[in-house]
Amino acid sequence: MPVITLPDGSQRHYDHAVSPMDVALDIGPGLAKACIAGRVNGELVDACDLIENDTQLSIITAKDEEGLEIIRHSCAHLLGHAIKQLWPHTKMAIGPVIDNGFYYDVDLDRTLTQEDVEALEKRMHELAEKNYDVIKKKVSWHEARETFANRGESYKVSILDENIAHDDKPGLYFHEEYVDMCRGPHVPNMRFCHHFKLMKTAGAYWRGDSNNKMLQRIYGTAWADKKALNAYLQRLEEAAKRDHRKIGKQLDLYHMQEEAPGMVFWHNDGWTIFRELEVFVRSKLKEYQYQEVKGPFMMDRVLWEKTGHWDNYKDAMFTTSSENREYCIKPMNCPGHVQIFNQGLKSYRDLPLRMAEFGSCHRNEPSGSLHGLMRVRGFTQDDAHIFCTEEQIRDEVNGCIRLVYDMYSTFGFEKIVVKLSTRPEKRIGSDEMWDRAEADLAVALEENNIPFEYQLGEGAFYGPKIEFTLYDCLDRAWQCGTVQLDFSLPSRLSASYVGEDNERKVPVMIHRAILGSMERFIGILTEEFAGFFPTWLAPVQVVIMNITDSQSDYVNELTQKLSNAGIRVKADLRNEKIGFKIREHTLRRVPYMLVCGDKEVESGKVAVRTRRGKELGSMDVNEVIEKLQQEIRSRSLKQLEE
């Protein structure tokens, strides 16, 4: 009979099989009431599942991350329960958990309106408030198939036929008259599923295949309590205000149009930000001793066949033909950099060789996945490739890590999650080589005092990698930086150097990206700063305004003076009230507004105001220039007097 060992090391002995709920009740009624599921020897199980052998057991509650995920999964079933009551002929497809919520794909003979979604959410609340028990049954494959066939659930039958072995025992979860199929676990009672909201609907092909029927996908969010739900909805509201597409239009940064899906038309102000970002990155490339190169926009398909990209990536590549040759528009820069490395004989003395490029790349992303600057088809990568010896890996990775944190800190990103992906089952190279490579990456992170977690088996077949995910002011995750070791591509493209022993050797290649793509990073920054770009990045840094026509010459004189000092400045001499001008430029998020009236002309000064409405008073023009230059030069995130 089972001996149950709890997380604190204490043990409980039973003379019969028990469930996690039984153990929770044995510990106390409060824990039993909070029990959602159990973790048995590291595996999540339902609260009702019986434990027959000695076991390590943790009780899962709504306070646990796993508990919240279970609540969300059960809310997907609740959605299914409600939709079948409202529209009984609906066919249910899949309803998984996603970040912050869940969705369900359904086959319904009507297009859901906003009123339908509201009615569906209302019915979900009515059902959840009944606090009914969720009943789990493990059945044979044949019984499960018969159950769903009798109910006309053709998608569930398809899942059983194509994805579940005949000797398996699927789990059926009964929500009163509604039944769903899942691996589980799920909540034991619907009292855990009171705090949710349906968010939106979208189209989704069955099994993600455009040859299949288009289903309707209903998205929802769910949380453990009302406070967490409201906080999330408030974050979404704030995110909507910060949406880079909305701000991009408001600030006239860029646009996109039907004739070039996923391609950016940069306007003057947006392109100014782009170029300033390039200047910043170039300054860091120089500091960290990189070469900057430029590869061709497209190359013969033969080269992409050699690299393996054609076999694995051709659906995402744009192609064109000329003179009976097929060319691929590059989706990435690395093969071109190997071609540059291969020009001329290289010695171990030439290594490490650090090669960077602002490469214009294109990928044929599905049209439905395109999203402003965040997901595009044409983009500029800020990546680089380092060619080095195995002995140099650790030092080079160290340099990459320092560069990543150096650049991210400039923008105020402080929360960065780091993951180290290790060898997959299918890989090239010896275990000894992988041992050393993984150790080099881990030691480099440790030497920089960077906490990280392993992603076992998640590395590429050609080498391990480090991923850097930054979190913005709304605590959203953005995976931007990577440091990837590559033991394959140099060999495929015949890259070599002469070693100390005068023998030809294949260099190790380190793929290094920090911003990811310039376009996406500008989108991230736009939302992070809500359009209030730090002065050094702002398209227009200063606007100088007159109150009446009599100050026009003075404004023009000052505008020229600031421009000569390297400050991006504009004059606003329109015949409008000064309050109107200030409001307009405040909405345009211009960092500084200098107001010139008769008093300023007489004194040779300016009245300084920030976009946040702070009056800095009357200041000498040279003092303003000096302070602005310092703020811009230091790439400060703060304005004067902040």
Curated annotation (Swiss-Prot):
Modification N6-acetyllysine occurs at: 286
Binding site for Zn(2+): 334, 385, 511
UniProt-listed Pfam families: HGTP_anticodon, TGS, tRNA-synt_2b, tRNA_SAD
Coiled coil: none
Any one Gene Ontology molecular-function term assigned to this protein's record: ATP binding
Main location: cytoplasm
Record text on cofactor binding: Binds 1 zinc ion per subunit.
SMART domains in alphabetical order: tRNA_SAD (SM00863)
Domain of life the protein comes from: Bacteria
InterPro entries hit by this protein: aa-tRNA-synt_IIb, aa-tRNA-synth_II, aa-tRNA-synth_II/BPL/LPL, Anticodon-bd, Anticodon-bd_dom_sf, Beta-grasp_dom_sf, TGS, TGS-like
One GO cellular component term: cytosol
One biological process term in Gene Ontology: threonyl-tRNA aminoacylation
Subcellular location: Cytoplasm
Keyword set, alphabetical order: Acetylation, Aminoacyl-tRNA synthetase, ATP-binding, Cytoplasm, Ligase, Metal-binding, Nucleotide-binding, Protein biosynthesis, RNA-binding, tRNA-binding, Zinc
Catalytic activity: tRNA(Thr) + L-threonine + ATP = L-threonyl-tRNA(Thr) + AMP + diphosphate + H(+)
Task performed by this protein: Catalyzes the attachment of threonine to tRNA(Thr) in a two-step reaction: L-threonine is first activated by ATP to form Thr-AMP and then transferred to the acceptor end of tRNA(Thr). Also edits incorrectly charged L-seryl-tRNA(Thr).
Family the UniProt entry places it in: Belongs to the class-II aminoacyl-tRNA synthetase family.
Stored NCBIfam families: thrS
Quaternary assembly: Homodimer.
Name of the molecule in the record: Threonine--tRNA ligase
Originating species: Shigella dysenteriae serotype 1 (strain Sd197)
Gene this chain is encoded by: thrS
